[in-house]
């Protein structure tokens, strides 16, 4: 059995670690709430653009933007959004499993796959696999800036317009609630058929005058909409990261508390044994006299 002094040192070490994990839990909780607010505030913007795009595209316009046209899929682009930091449980592992499963499915259909990576963890993982990486970005911090994300997104979109990619998907961790985050893959382009519910039940009867013309407006709005979708995915993934980190740090704090209790019990037994030995020595010495 370890000595009492050694056990006290272990208890002190675990207590120090417990303070760190508790602080990280509280910081993650605060950041998660801020990210949730950012996530909620960006949704109406994306929804409003979606409604206008739907109305224009259904207004009998003789113009079809490339982002709205389905074509034979020979090359697929996947934008994978991971975290820059660890200590967030199995968040990235589950995301990578989802992405690898989809990549495998595409390759079994003889479809080439190109990746766009956001997040240091994803960059490190997929680079080690030797996959085709078109673009990458890391170092977003806790408050991602849309302008910094537009570059990597536009490189994927330009490849689509040039015919180098036939479809683009985004993979990220969708924030369900504090205890649940789900890795999902969503199609970015060609855009799935949009509805115009956000414009109201009688939106089909509304007449608009578009300046300078519907084609120019649609071109601009589609790019803005896709950029907002990428930003929304990044923010949702960030909220998932903070939630997962908060849960992981709480579990670590609780485990540290249990370990301290166990060590305290061992310490008490060691101290009791030490006192018993001392008493036995005293009794033995007295008997010898």
UniProtKB/Swiss-Prot annotation:
Gene Ontology CC terms: plasma membrane; proton-transporting ATP synthase complex
TM region(s), chain numbering: none
Localisation per UniProt entry: Cell inner membrane
Gene3D superfamilies: 3.40.1380.10, ATP synthase, gamma subunit, helix hairpin domain (1.10.287.80)
Bilayer topology: Peripheral membrane protein
Record's keyword terms, sorted: ATP synthesis, Cell inner membrane, Cell membrane, CF(1), Hydrogen ion transport, Ion transport, Membrane, Transport
InterPro entries named among the record's database cross-references: ATP_synth_F1_ATPase_gsu, ATP_synth_F1_gsu, ATP_synth_F1_gsu_CS
Principal location: membrane
CDD domains: F1-ATPase_gamma
Top-level lineage group: Bacteria
BP GO annotations: proton motive force-driven plasma membrane ATP synthesis
HAMAP family: ATP_synth_gamma_bact
NCBIfam families: ATPsyn_F1gamma, PRK05621.1-1
SUBUNIT field: F-type ATPases have 2 components, CF(1) - the catalytic core - and CF(0) - the membrane proton channel. CF(1) has five subunits: alpha(3), beta(3), gamma(1), delta(1), epsilon(1). CF(0) has three main subunits: a, b and c.
Task performed by this protein: Produces ATP from ADP in the presence of a proton gradient across the membrane. The gamma chain is believed to be important in regulating ATPase activity and the flow of protons through the CF(0) complex.
UniProt family annotation: Belongs to the ATPase gamma chain family.
Annotated protein name in UniProt: ATP synthase gamma chain
Organism annotation: Histophilus somni (strain 129Pt) (Haemophilus somnus)
Gene that produces this protein: atpG
């Amino acid at each position: 059995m370890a000595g009492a002094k050694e056990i006290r040192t272990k208890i002190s070490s675990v207590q120090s670690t417990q303070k760190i994990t508790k602080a990280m839990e509280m910081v993650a909780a605060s950041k998660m709430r801020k990210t949730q607010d950012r996530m909620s505030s960006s949704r109406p913007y994306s929804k409003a653009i979606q409604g206008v795009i739907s109305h224009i595209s259904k207004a009998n316009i003789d113009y079809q933007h490339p982002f709205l046209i389905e074509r034979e899929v020979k090359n697929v682009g996947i934008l994978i959004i991971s975290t820059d930091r660890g200590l967030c449980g199995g968040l990235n592992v589950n995301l990578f499993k989802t992405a690898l499963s989809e990549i495998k499915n595409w390759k079994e259909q003889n479809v080439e796959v190109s990746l766009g990576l956001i997040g240091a963890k994803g960059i490190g993982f997929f680079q080690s696999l030797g996959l085709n990486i078109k673009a990458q970005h890391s170092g977003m911090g806790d408050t991602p800036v849309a302008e910094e994300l537009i570059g990597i997104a536009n490189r994927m979109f330009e490849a689509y317009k040039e015919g180098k990619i036939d479809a683009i998907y985004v993979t990220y961790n969708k924030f369900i609630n504090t205890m649940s985050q789900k890795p999902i893959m969503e199609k970015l382009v060609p855009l799935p058929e949009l509805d115009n519910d956000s414009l109201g039940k009688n939106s089909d009867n509304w007449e608009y005058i578009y300046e300078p013309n519907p084609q120019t407006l649609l071109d601009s709005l589609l790019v803005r909409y896709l950029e907002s979708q990428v930003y929304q995915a990044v923010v949702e993934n960030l909220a998932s990261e903070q939630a997962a980190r908060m849960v992981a740090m709480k579990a670590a704090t609780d485990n540290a508390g249990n370990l301290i209790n166990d060590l305290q019990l061992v310490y008490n037994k060691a101290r009791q044994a030490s006192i018993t030995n001392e008493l036995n020595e005293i009794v033995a010495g007295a008997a010898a006299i």
